[in-house]
Amino acid sequence: MTQSNPFQQYGITSGLAAAAAAKASVLAAMGTISDYVGVPTPIGLRIEVKVEMMKQIDARSGIAAVRKFSGDNPDTLNGALFESRAVIRDDGLINIFAGEGIGVAVSDGLPVRRGDPAINPVARMMIENAVREVSGSAGFDVYISVPGGEDLARDTMNPRVGISGGISILGTTGIEEPVSGPDYEAHIEYLLQTGRCVSTVAVMCPGNTAMRFAESYLRLHPASFILTGDRIGSAIEMAIEKGYREIVVFGLPGKLVKMAAGVMNTHSRIADARFETIAAYAALNGADRDTISKILSSNTVESAFAVLRSIGLLDSVAGAIASRIVERLRSPVWQIRRILLRHDRFRRQAIRVSPVAGHIETGE
């Protein structure tokens, strides 16, 4: 599937991949072999999914496999093989079992009960609906597995949120968007819901680099750290709704500067305003026309900061921008009582903003 922008591709969620594999294995058990299976989604669309392998084992069972495709979304599970084995039952019941590579809930507060397989309710519904499309009056035991899933899960949020031993089968729409869209927002909400069980602090990190550095910098429970992608504003709103007492925004300047301009979805397709924002605050702090021109001609925020550093204005401009971000996030729209905003660029430059007055420290 392709967005209106031909360079951006949608993918399928782990829930849809599992549903496609399950349906294919049921068809195989019934003696029908096909290269593709159609799977219904909760949003009313039907998705045709390519079947990697499909085989009837005997008159009562079949196996099939589907390879997950994540489109342009950076996803640990892209290319992972979802396998399913279906065995006919005589009582008409459809039972879904988790096999190799599927995690188990080991914490409370998750969408599934402690001790149950990490197959979320909507994903389980998708699997059952896909199977029932072709099962007729027959029942089936369906066993889903992801070879190597335990290793893949180490690079996901599962160890943080209380899923052990493998991946989760997720998805609210069946469709994986290439940027932080509604399906990813559901994932953020899931992380915030589970994190709230163990922490009152939510650390919003727009990217993996910020996430890794935040984890090394802040002494907090692992579930406190939320990878928001571009949906920082939505993540903050959800954290407020879920009763977090403190929200930390921790990221690199390319994302954070946009927030000073009120841009809370930081994807470049939505808005930019980085250099205009830096230039405006540089002008307010005494920068001349030549400096403003250099900032507006910069290719990166770091290069714009270098211009300011060369004339001794970096601290004052960065402080003003940081104060404005804090002001934005403290507005009645957000209703946040306390904000701690941090930016750190490892050893090159560090900016830290206090929650009291937007005080800023910069240094090499």
From Swiss-Prot:
Species the sequence originates in: Thermoplasma acidophilum (strain ATCC 25905 / DSM 1728 / JCM 9062 / NBRC 15155 / AMRC-C165)
Catalytic activity reported: Co-precorrin-5B + S-adenosyl-L-methionine = Co-precorrin-6A + S-adenosyl-L-homocysteine
Descriptive protein name: Cobalt-precorrin-5B C(1)-methyltransferase
Family listed: Belongs to the CbiD family.
Record keywords, A-Z: Cobalamin biosynthesis, Methyltransferase, S-adenosyl-L-methionine, Transferase
Entry's Gene Ontology BP terms: anaerobic cobalamin biosynthetic process; methylation
Pfam families xref list: CbiD
UniProt keyword annotation of Methyltransferase present: yes
GO molecular function: cobalt-precorrin-5B C1-methyltransferase activity
UniProt KW Zinc keyword: no
Pathway the protein contributes to: Cofactor biosynthesis; adenosylcobalamin biosynthesis; cob(II)yrinate a,c-diamide from sirohydrochlorin (anaerobic route): step 6/10
Gene this chain is encoded by: cbiD
EC number(s) stated in the UniProt entry for this protein: 2.1.1.195
PANTHER family: COBALT-PRECORRIN-5B C(1)-METHYLTRANSFERASE
Source organism superkingdom: Archaea
